Amino acid sequence: RNIKQHLDLIAGLPGEDYESFRRSFNDVHSIRPEEIQLGFLKLLKGSSMREEAEKYGMVYSPYPPYEIIKTDKVSYKEMIRLKKVEEMVDKYYNSQKFNNTLKFFYEKYETPFDFFYDLGNFFEARGYFNRNIGNTEYYKVFLDFNMEILKGDESYLKDIIKYDYLSFNKRRGMPDFIKSNIDKQLELQIKDELRERYSFKDYQIEKFDIDMSEYLNTGKIIKKECFYLVGNNCEIIKI
């Protein structure tokens, strides 16, 4: 599809509680729009919503943009939870740079909302909301989260993270935590076979321990040694 879908969800609307917002998020997510924008109701001066604030138990910031803090249906603590989900969705989902890795984690949760909530709690526990973290750290978070929270095997996950990383970042700066070693003799053999078709000034050979093509197409993880050419402009070609 050529038209990008951008869908908005507003927290704090009259009559909506935490659970109904969770359901709304999962319904919107199931459409797989390119961007999900989570916003929080703002009670602007002169608006009809501001005039009815007391009716719905709405408490809002006294400072512009007068954002909602709590309602009679959503407590302050629940609003903070939604803020954490918003941060994770904006960074990881809306960037479209982590799609394959996110798919890995969705399979481990009842809903995508629940995953983003847990990831937000992990960010908070690590203090990541209070400081700037580097580009590669955003990828490493997945490994740490998988190990500490889900107690999961990281061997397959590393390959999926690596594929996402190489799709948007140059191989030269690839972090050690997703690097894999390829047998030098085998590397020379592959280069000899492909030398007439590809310049190895522009491409490097990268080894994966799962069939990434199968995972991309079906979501199935099949253990199989595969090799890909990774171009200087983030082009990835299966060989």
Q: Predicted regions span which residues?
A:
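A structural motif corresponding to the C-terminal lobe/cap of the Radical SAM core domain
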Residues: R1-F115
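Radical SAM enzyme core and accessory elements
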Residues: E87-I239
